[in-house]
Amino acid sequence: MKPYLDLMRHVLEHGTRKDDRTGTGTLSVFGWQTRYDLAAGFPLVTTKKCHLRSIVHELLWFLQGDTNIRYLKENGVSIWDEWADENGDLGPVYGHQWRSWPKADGGVIDQIAEAVKTLRTNPDSRRIIVSAWNVADLDRMALAPCHAFFQFYVAEGRLSCQLYQRSADIFLGVPFNIASYALLTLMMAQVTGLKPGDFVHTLGDAHLYVNHLEQAREQLSREPRPLPTMTLNPDVTDIFGFRFEDFTLGGYDPHPAIKAPVAV
């Protein structure tokens, strides 16, 4: 996870102090890219323990097109609690846009299903894209999409994914985002008969909140450990058919977790 740690170090040393929506304040840089070879291990941060259960359940929740936190709460995941209304609703956030992008004629587009179809029938297409950034729906979302837009790319039988993330909370959010999209790439590769390639992470406003700086320094003081492996149930051939028990993380030996407040 050297690319992630290099980003954190760079922002600590060269970031610009900025105000932000939450009123917390950040150190920020604009425009950064990291790359992770998914054949070299599963990119889950080892310099602190990450809660894989939350990552997996959130991704499955997105893929089901769900926008109510009930499923997450039932599975012990609280990462969306601060933004939900009294009924647990979040508005037309990620899952809605991924699975039910509204059309002008009143219909919807299932972007994930379309991506799978195109990967199977026209893998050289440069249009295998999923967007969560629906300008017309932003005002109805509890939180505008941070990881806004991703594209799949096939070369020599290997599937790569590039994510554009407009806003990147380096300490708390980015480790989740890396693992989530790496996992999605593994899943998409399996159901389309491809091998995993790279996950490319392109960041817009990459920032450390000022109340995360000491935690970031503590993390940078730790020696990275070998990356774990991620094994998927080979019997699953439908991207919407995965369940939590279909994922097995092996060899994960992280340093202890480091607590930090969430900026809401």
From Swiss-Prot:
One record GO biological process: methylation
InterPro entries with a match to the protein in the record: Thymidate_synth/dCMP_Mease, Thymidate_synth/dCMP_Mease_dom, Thymidate_synth/dCMP_Mease_sf, Thymidylate_synthase, Thymidylate_synthase_AS
EC number, UniProt record: 2.1.1.45
Principal place of residence: cytoplasm
GO molecular function: thymidylate synthase activity
Alphabetic keyword roster: Cytoplasm, Methyltransferase, Nucleotide biosynthesis, Transferase
GO CC terms of this entry: cytosol
CDD domains: TS_Pyrimidine_HMase
Cell compartment(s), UniProt: Cytoplasm
Highest taxon above the source species: Bacteria
Pathway: Pyrimidine metabolism; dTTP biosynthesis
Catalytic activity annotation: dUMP + (6R)-5,10-methylene-5,6,7,8-tetrahydrofolate = 7,8-dihydrofolate + dTMP
Binding site for dUMP: 21, 126-127, 166-169, 177, 207-209
Binding locations of (6R)-5,10-methylene-5,6,7,8-tetrahydrofolate: 51, 169, 263
Active-site residue list: 146 (nucleophile)
PANTHER family: THYMIDYLATE SYNTHASE, THYMIDYLATE SYNTHASE 1
UniProt similarity note: Belongs to the thymidylate synthase family. Bacterial-type ThyA subfamily.
Subunit relationships: Homodimer.
Function description: Catalyzes the reductive methylation of 2'-deoxyuridine-5'-monophosphate (dUMP) to 2'-deoxythymidine-5'-monophosphate (dTMP) while utilizing 5,10-methylenetetrahydrofolate (mTHF) as the methyl donor and reductant in the reaction, yielding dihydrofolate (DHF) as a by-product. This enzymatic reaction provides an intracellular de novo source of dTMP, an essential precursor for DNA biosynthesis.
Record-linked NCBIfam families: PRK01827.1-3, PRK01827.1-5, thym_sym
Name of the molecule in the record: Thymidylate synthase
Source organism of the structure: Thiobacillus denitrificans (strain ATCC 25259 / T1)
Organism classification: Bacteria, Pseudomonadati, Pseudomonadota, Betaproteobacteria, Nitrosomonadales
